[in-house]
Curated annotation (Swiss-Prot):
InterPro entries: DA_C
An example molecular function term from Gene Ontology annotations: isomerase activity
Disulphide connectivity of cysteines: none
Pfam families documented for this protein: DA_C, DA_N
Top-level taxon of origin: Eukaryota
Pathway connected to this protein: Mycotoxin biosynthesis
Keywords tagged on the record: Isomerase
Organism name: Fungal sp. (strain NRRL 50135)
Protein name per Swiss-Prot or TrEMBL: Diels-Alderase gNR600
Enzyme Commission number: 5.5.1.-
Length: 408
């Protein structure tokens, strides 16, 4: 019998605590969209729902990451990171905070049926006077075919993002085993909708100062009929990111007939500085490589793995500019000045696909350490791509982001 399941977190209550909290188990063959920490979340844990779309050549792009974690406690809300870029290079980026995070599921169990998420402000201010309604909401259909994100944040952003799964076999997008959903032990990271077509119709407000008078409103549009694509991420863990990694690269891109989605991290000293990844490659909307094992370039070249059983793998290497090169390049704003990445997918049958990503346009940037020669941060780019299998050279574009954390 169908029912409605509800998970409510209120930043002003006792929803964020210190110490262990109950965590619902991973469900094989499911998108696991309903929260895993349903009534409370501890101060190291996090849950993520992410949506993004970009135009055919990456001229315009938008992304939103909705979090449940402790990072916004001192700001009075669970945070949402929203970023947009226009063809002329204009950018908009804000971290928004919402006192309440509510997720509901309509189905026979929390992991079946339609999902609705609400990040919203409280209906009253501390003094009891009505407050302006602010919210970001999302709905995901039962078959994972459509996700709609609605923005209603007056004087900042309004409008919608719509993602439509374009994969011919949606079941193949879902991890059949817990291992297939793991980025790192106890860290889950999934692309449950697979390749998607994207539409976005949004209006952003610009002001000279935070909370100041609106000086300009600007519309942003991404259309699937014009080649708009994107991705959707679901992740969660009881482990804070700095506990297991110090470097990460995320990308979603459309390159010719290929669609690729990936998060690769480099482990911290506590994790042995090993690489870890969740990577998916689609050809003509069919999944051809599902890698949960990251290897270095030498292992990729040799086709060797740490196990005897053939497995899909991915290798990721940074590209640095030649010291005396006159080439115009784009890099991050921090100490890591890489200009792109080489991504190689290797199937268990040793089929290979290589993609060269170069940072095409800088998008967003934020420090994660104090300024200085070794400063770290996170940077986002519109990425240009070349690649495919042996003998193929497709062009494409996507969105990518790098994160470095100042831990050993």
């Amino acid at each position: 019998m169908a029912g409605t399941f509800v998970s409510v977190l209120d930043i002003s209550g006792d929803s964020v605590v210190t110490g262990p909290v109950p965590v619902e188990p991973f469900v094989p063959g499911s998108a696991n969209l309903f929260p895993k920490m349903t009534s409370r979340i501890n101060d190291t844990a996090w849950e993520l729902w992410e949506f993004e779309g970009f135009s055919a050549g990456g001229e315009a792009a938008v992304g939103v990451s909705l979090y449940r974690d402790a990072r916004g406690v001192d700001k009075g809300g669970f945070h949402a990171e929203v970023n947009a870029i226009w063809p002329d290079g204009r950018k908009w980026g804000q971290t928004l905070y919402f006192a309440e995070s509510i997720v509901t599921a309509e189905g026979a169990s929390p992991d079946e049926g339609r999902i609705h998420g609400f990040w919203r402000s409280n209906s009253n201010t501390a003094g009891g006077a009505p407050a302006a309604a602010r919210s970001i909401t999302f709905s995901i259909s039962e078959d994972l075919g459509v996700a709609t994100v609605c923005f209603s944040v007056p004087d900042q952003v309004t409008g919608t993002i719509e993602l439509r799964s374009s994969g011919s076999n949606r079941k193949s997008c879902l991890p059949a085993t817990e291992e297939a959903a793991l980025l790192y032990p106890s860290v889950y990271y999934m692309f449950p909708m697979g390749p998607v077509d994207a539409n976005a119709d949004l209006t952003f407000s610009f002001s000279a100062t935070a909370g100041g008078e609106i000086e300009e409103e600007r519309k942003l549009s991404v259309q699937s009929r014009g080649g708009g694509h994107g991705g959707m991420v679901r992740g969660w863990s009881t482990e804070a990111w700095p506990q297991f990694m110090n470097d990460a690269y995320y990308v979603v891109a459309k390159v010719g007939s290929y669609m690729l989605q990936m998060l690769r991290v480099v482990g911290s000293a506590a994790a042995g500085h090993r690489p870890y990844a969740v990577a998916r490659l689609y050809l003509n909307k069919e999944l051809v490589c599902a890698a949960n094992q990251a290897v270095d370039a030498q292992s990729a070249a040799e086709g060797s793995t740490a196990t005897t059983q053939p497995r899909d793998m991915v290798a990721v290497e940074k590209v640095l500019s030649e010291p005396k090169s006159q080439e115009q390049v784009v890099s991050g704003a921090f100490s890591d000045k890489n200009i792109g990445y080489v991504i190689e997918f290797i199937s268990g049958q040793q089929k290979r696909w290589r993609f060269d990503a170069r940072h095409k346009r800088a998008w967003w940037s934020e420090p994660t350490s104090a300024p200085g020669p070794g400063c770290t941060g996170k940077s986002g780019w519109i990425e240009g791509f070349l690649g495919g299998s042996d003998g193929e050279t497709f062009e494409g574009a996507g969105v990518g982001g790098q994160l470095q954390i100042p831990v050993p």
